[in-house]
Protein backbone atom coordinates (compact mmCIF):
# COMPACT_ATOMS: atom_id res chain seq x y z
CA UNK A 1 0.00 0.00 0.00
CA UNK A 2 1.31 3.39 -0.97
CA UNK A 3 1.57 5.94 1.77
CA UNK A 4 -0.50 9.10 1.41
CA UNK A 5 1.62 12.16 0.87
CA UNK A 6 1.13 14.45 3.82
CA UNK A 7 1.42 18.09 3.05
CA UNK A 8 3.36 20.22 5.48
CA UNK A 9 1.64 23.51 6.14
CA UNK A 10 4.09 26.26 5.28
CA UNK A 11 4.46 29.03 7.83
CA UNK A 12 2.82 32.01 6.25
CA UNK A 13 4.59 35.30 6.74
CA UNK A 14 2.42 37.49 8.90
CA UNK A 15 3.06 41.21 8.69
CA UNK A 16 2.57 42.40 12.26
CA UNK A 17 4.30 45.64 13.23
CA UNK A 18 3.50 45.77 16.97
CA UNK A 19 3.24 43.09 19.62
CA UNK A 20 3.83 42.04 23.22
CA UNK A 21 6.87 40.17 24.57
CA UNK A 22 6.03 38.01 27.58
CA UNK A 23 9.22 37.24 29.55
CA UNK A 24 8.62 34.50 32.13
CA UNK A 25 11.70 34.17 34.30
CA UNK A 26 11.58 31.48 36.98
CA UNK A 27 14.40 30.26 39.21
CA UNK A 28 15.00 27.34 36.82
CA UNK A 29 14.36 28.64 33.30
CA UNK A 30 13.51 31.72 31.23
CA UNK A 31 10.78 31.60 28.58
CA UNK A 32 10.09 34.37 26.06
CA UNK A 33 6.85 34.47 24.05
CA UNK A 34 6.24 37.21 21.50
CA UNK A 35 2.59 37.64 20.55
CA UNK A 36 0.49 40.16 18.68
CA UNK A 37 -1.62 42.67 20.61
CA UNK A 38 -4.55 40.22 20.80
CA UNK A 39 -2.33 37.56 22.41
CA UNK A 40 -1.87 35.19 19.45
CA UNK A 41 1.62 33.68 19.59
CA UNK A 42 4.05 34.65 16.84
CA UNK A 43 7.35 33.31 18.15
CA UNK A 44 8.70 31.80 21.33
CA UNK A 45 11.93 30.51 22.77
CA UNK A 46 13.34 29.38 26.09
CA UNK A 47 16.71 28.69 27.64
CA UNK A 48 15.97 24.96 27.38
CA UNK A 49 15.24 25.07 23.65
CA UNK A 50 18.52 26.92 23.10
CA UNK A 51 20.36 23.82 24.29
CA UNK A 52 21.07 24.75 27.90
CA UNK A 53 20.52 21.95 30.39
CA UNK A 54 20.19 21.84 34.16
CA UNK A 55 21.38 24.79 36.21
CA UNK A 56 22.75 26.58 33.12
CA UNK A 57 19.15 27.27 32.02
CA UNK A 58 18.74 29.73 34.89
CA UNK A 59 21.72 31.92 33.90
CA UNK A 60 21.37 35.43 32.45
CA UNK A 61 23.35 34.36 29.37
CA UNK A 62 20.83 31.61 28.57
CA UNK A 63 18.00 34.15 28.89
CA UNK A 64 19.86 36.50 26.55
CA UNK A 65 20.28 33.80 23.90
CA UNK A 66 16.59 32.82 24.15
CA UNK A 67 15.46 36.46 23.83
CA UNK A 68 17.66 37.00 20.76
CA UNK A 69 16.22 33.87 19.14
CA UNK A 70 12.59 34.87 19.82
CA UNK A 71 13.23 38.43 18.59
CA UNK A 72 14.83 37.19 15.37
CA UNK A 73 11.83 34.93 14.65
CA UNK A 74 9.41 37.80 15.37
CA UNK A 75 11.29 40.19 13.08
CA UNK A 76 10.86 37.69 10.25
CA UNK A 77 7.11 38.30 10.64
CA UNK A 78 7.59 42.08 10.40
CA UNK A 79 7.64 42.92 14.12
CA UNK A 80 9.16 46.33 14.91
CA UNK A 81 7.76 47.62 18.20
CA UNK A 82 6.93 45.63 21.33
CA UNK A 83 5.63 46.11 24.82
CA UNK A 84 7.36 43.92 27.40
CA UNK A 85 5.60 42.07 30.23
CA UNK A 86 8.06 40.61 32.74
CA UNK A 87 6.92 37.91 35.14
CA UNK A 88 8.78 36.00 37.83
CA UNK A 89 11.77 36.40 40.15
CA UNK A 90 14.48 34.78 38.01
CA UNK A 91 17.93 36.02 37.10
CA UNK A 92 17.16 36.29 33.38
CA UNK A 93 14.80 39.27 33.55
CA UNK A 94 17.22 42.12 32.88
CA UNK A 95 19.39 40.32 30.33
CA UNK A 96 16.32 39.24 28.33
CA UNK A 97 15.15 42.87 28.21
CA UNK A 98 18.56 44.07 27.04
CA UNK A 99 18.72 41.34 24.40
CA UNK A 100 15.28 42.28 23.02
CA UNK A 101 16.37 45.92 22.74
CA UNK A 102 19.73 44.99 21.18
CA UNK A 103 18.02 42.77 18.59
CA UNK A 104 16.51 45.88 17.01
CA UNK A 105 13.01 45.81 18.50
CA UNK A 106 11.70 49.17 19.71
CA UNK A 107 10.46 48.73 23.31
CA UNK A 108 7.57 51.08 24.11
CA UNK A 109 6.72 49.99 27.67
CA UNK A 110 7.87 47.57 30.35
CA UNK A 111 5.35 46.10 32.80
CA UNK A 112 6.00 43.79 35.75
CA UNK A 113 3.08 41.35 35.91
CA UNK A 114 4.50 39.08 38.63
CA UNK A 115 1.57 37.72 40.67
CA UNK A 116 1.84 38.80 44.29
CA UNK A 117 -0.01 36.75 46.91
CA UNK A 118 -1.95 38.72 49.54
CA UNK A 119 -0.96 36.19 52.21
CA UNK A 120 -2.02 33.22 50.11
CA UNK A 121 -0.31 29.81 50.08
CA UNK A 122 2.49 28.91 52.44
CA UNK A 123 5.87 29.38 50.68
CA UNK A 124 8.32 26.48 50.34
CA UNK A 125 10.73 25.93 53.21
CA UNK A 126 14.12 27.64 53.25
CA UNK A 127 16.96 25.75 51.58
CA UNK A 128 19.77 24.54 53.79
CA UNK A 129 22.89 24.25 51.67
From Swiss-Prot:
The keyword Amino-acid biosynthesis does not apply. PROSITE patterns: RIBOSOMAL_S11 (PS00054). Keywords: Ribonucleoprotein, Ribosomal protein, RNA-binding, rRNA-binding. One of its GO terms (biological process) is translation. The keyword Transferase does not apply. One of its GO terms (cellular component) is ribonucleoprotein complex. One of its GO terms (molecular function) is rRNA binding. Belongs to the universal ribosomal protein uS11 family. HAMAP family: Ribosomal_uS11 (MF_01310). Part of the 30S ribosomal subunit. Interacts with proteins S7 and S18. Binds to IF-3. Located on the platform of the 30S subunit, it bridges several disparate RNA helices of the 16S rRNA. Forms part of the Shine-Dalgarno cleft in the 70S ribosome. NCBIfam families: PRK05309.1 (NF003698), uS11_bact (TIGR03632). This is Small ribosomal subunit protein uS11. It comes from Cereibacter sphaeroides (strain ATCC 17025 / ATH 2.4.3). The gene is rpsK.
Amino acid sequence: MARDKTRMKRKERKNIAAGVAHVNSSFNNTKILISDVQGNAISWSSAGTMGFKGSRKSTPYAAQMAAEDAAKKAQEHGMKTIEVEVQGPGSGRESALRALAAAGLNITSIRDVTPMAHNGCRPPKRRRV
